[in-house]
Amino acid sequence: MAEILAALRSLMSSHDPPLHALVVPSEDYHQSEYVSARDKRREFVSGFTGSAGLALITMNEALLWTDGRYFLQATQELTGEWKLMRMLEDPAVDVWMANNLPNDAAIGVDPWCVSIDTAQRWERAFAKKQQKLVQTSTNLVDKVWKNRPPAETYPVTVQQIEFAGSSVVEKLKELREKLTNEKARGIIITTLDEVAWLYNIRGTDVPYCPVVHAFAIVTTNAAFLYVDKRKVSSEVISFLKESGVEVRDYDAVSSDVVLLQSNQLNPPADVQGSDLIWADPNSCSYALYSKLNSDKVLLQQSPLALAKAIKNPVELDGLKKAHIRDGAAIVQYIVWLDKQMQEIYGASGYFLEGEATKEKKHSGTVKLTEVTVSDKLESFRASKEHFRGLSFPTISSVGPNAAIMHYSPQSETCAEMDPNSIYLCDSGAQLFNYIFEALTPQKAHMQMSNLSMAFHDQTPEVLKGHIALGNAVFPNGTCGHTLDILARLPLWKYGLDYRHGTGHGVGSYLNVHEGPQSISFKPRNVPIHASMTATDEPGYYEDGNFGIRLENVLVVTDANTKFNFGDKGYMSFEHITWAPYQIKMINLKSLTPEEIDWLNAYHSRCRDILAPYLDETELAWLKKATEPASA
């Protein structure tokens, strides 16, 4: 890392103007959360592998900002002169730069890797000190990255109508109606999952996310896809052409946004008094925005974000079917894991009741590690229809590793499975037409007699919050941050909390994290709508000891309430994740009778729904694991 920092500082000194600081964001040209290997610039310069963060390099300091999910991981991965800056605890990066860099400082950033909103926020902070945000003409990190991975050329595929549920023509019609309503002649679409959803295409350019590196421009009478043409077959070009979409070179988007502004993009837009260009300030790059007349730009959330988040009936049906198949895979995995732990440690059950020994039963057994069991889970999933890979790196974590919220085990350094430690597994998969995030709703595996009092006390509180959120009934127009308290309140009563959000949407064979809806302590003024998805995943983490996280995926439905105060309409959640909670890990005396009734009802549905997908041994195990609980 020292050599990389030295090389970057040399480029900063020779830059015109000389740079006092260089910002290296995590994002790519599309403001993606997950990026391809060649776009992991922040990871390259800092060594921090988490998905979220921002690096700042000055002439004598190197700082890394990240959120609460990654505090522990960043502490372990940052070396040398790198210093961790904790978001929401330490000064924000723009505040730090304004207060710690000299007046008139020049602060460099690749404008393609920063959004309009972020860049403008920084500029406002810098103006107080006459500091300047400098858009570098090339990415300085790329200049020092000697073995940077090559660009991807994976083929683009079509998401057929029987899976998409809505045609490109239909989606373009609805989008153009929104353009007309906002008096906009066109819209620039930069978010990868929005481009993929709008044009019913998919790809493999980004690990775990079936998207294509591409931009889109849609006007009142034309639509364009900007992509590396090497990825697009004649069949895909024909499909897009029939849908009214023209394929252009990826780099042509820069010049075409200028033509769009002057209405010289061929064919010209049917203006009818509309001269605004719509750009999402949170996803459109500052580079593209800088090419436009700012007075003629409509800075507003992309209408595709909400359209994509509200699933159509075909998408919802696929989502539910995917979770049933995944529930069967999880049960098969736990049955296998139970058997392995019995053979190795002599326990009568890893998930069910039984006493484990501290020593292996016999030495010749194949070693079980966080990675080998994770690979086995993937193999069970891979046996299911339409499997297309994982939707994010599996978090397979034993003991203290489970306290690292987004822990990713590596074969060389991972821990061995241990019957006397908590095991947490957070995983998800892509199925051709669906995506799901599925966690064994109770991931801890250990004998209750060996548990610390902290774990014994906190597991039911996490479950209480999980149940409370999943059972919520709320008026139409409610935003996610209003519901977030339901999941946290049981922990708050003990003076405890968790640093991540409680819930996010999931895509339809797209990204595992999908907005604009969010259930989080961070306010986001986006109402929750019927047919949206949301995860329900409270947790608790004790550094150096264990981690707890319970998660189901929910679908928002209309609630059949007795009354309808204010004629608002009321909504509730439908659970679509099916896998058993680990009863032996729960202090049932801490649950109310109503919570135990809910748990038993959920387990009854698990048995009924998953039974057709399990063999005799697996079904017998499931029946045992879901026997009615009582305090």
Range-by-range predicted roles:
Residues 1-631:
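Active-site neighborhoods and metal-handling regions in enzymes and metal-associated proteins
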